[in-house]
Amino acid sequence: MADAATITKLEEGFKKLEAATDCKSLLKKYLTKSVFDQLKAKKTSLGATLLDVIQSGVENLDSGVGVYAPDAEAYTLFSPLFDPIIEDYHKGFKQTDKHPNKDFGDVNQFVNVDPDGKFVISTRVRCGRSMEGYPFNPCLTEAQYKEMESKVSSTLSNLEGELKGTYHALTGMTKDVQQKLIDDHFLFKEGDRFLQAANACRYWPTGRGIYHNDNKTFLVWCNEEDHLRIISMQMGGDLGQVYRRLVTAVNDIEKRVPFSHHDRLGFLTFCPTNLGTTVRASVHIKLPKLAANRDKLEEVAGKYSLQVRGTRGEHTEAEGGVYDISNKRRMGLTEFQAVKEMQDGILELIKIEKEMQ
């Protein structure tokens, strides 16, 4: 049972949400009085309550989603809130649906989407993973952060071939290394106000770090928003090469570190928007003609379930007609299907851009 102080805070938070008529978050939409009453006293075995789930969305009324999972059990215990939010965000992933088993498919189906190098500046595929047996950020202790980091760094130090590289702990990092990682756009900063409010940045920078291979085409973030963010990237449009590298790495790491997986929801992550495959495949792409015809761009993007963002990611503008375009769907389809959908969409965008020139 949640304690009285927590329940009081929850009641206040619920009142604040109810009063916020211009709040458009999925939290506000689905945290009805009956769902609230059903969940307010519940507590996971690691001690997480509904307050841990909703506090970021209560503090930041401009959130798009507004909920985070403090631990893996939260997705089950607080499912009357999570399930409708998941269904709404991952369009069409119904509460009776089951995410398919992991399937990276035939990696040779992926190609260089821009062999002439005229449109695509860079290509990146990432996934998120949580380590089994550990809660997510808000419930982690300082000792757990350290323990996880040592498991991750020793696991990664065994990677070979193209993936061989160096682990840099954020704790005690020298200014030189820090600057170098910033210049390479590798360094992650302490969380934004949404993550701060979710208590995702405690004991910072303990247990946080960055691994990269010698070529700087493979990157692992340890204990940023998720336990692990595994990233493969390079300049140009060779999606095939980027995808193959990621798949090799994930399969290798998985042999040594068991990941949290849910029968219905797939791979578990801190934020429900990343569940399922957790895969985000993206390109930075120059589309000057389509940029001038935003409706056409959005129409094609919609057809292939692509998300169009500004150059520097979420909530930014396109600089010089350069967009960050990625797959939108992560749940209810396989890893292969998610990336294939993105490849098909990018090829179509390039074809249309060429026709408009």
Curated annotation (Swiss-Prot):
Keywords in UniProt for this one? Acetylation, ATP-binding, Kinase, Nucleotide-binding, Transferase
| Record domain Phosphagen kinase N-terminal: where | 9-91
Swiss-Prot/TrEMBL catalytic activity: L-arginine + ATP = N(omega)-phospho-L-arginine + ADP + H(+)
Query: Which protein family is it in?
Result: Belongs to the ATP:guanido phosphotransferase family.
Q: Where does ATP bind?
A: 122-126, 185, 229, 280-284, 309-314
Q: Which GO terms describe its biological process?
A: phosphocreatine biosynthetic process
**According to the lineage, what is the superkingdom?**
Eukaryota
Q: Which InterPro entries match?
A: ATP-guanido_PTrfase (IPR000749), ATP-guanido_PTrfase_AS (IPR022415), ATP-guanido_PTrfase_cat (IPR022414), ATP-guanido_PTrfase_N (IPR022413), ATP-guanido_PTrfase_N_sf (IPR036802), Gln_synth/guanido_kin_cat_dom (IPR014746)
- Per the record, residues carrying N-acetylalanine are 2
Q: Provide a GO CC annotation, any one.
A: extracellular space
The entry's protein name is: Arginine kinase
Report domain Phosphagen kinase C-terminal positions: 119-356
Enzyme class per UniProt = transferase
Specify which residues bind L-arginine according to the UniProt entry for this protein: 64-68, 225, 271, 314
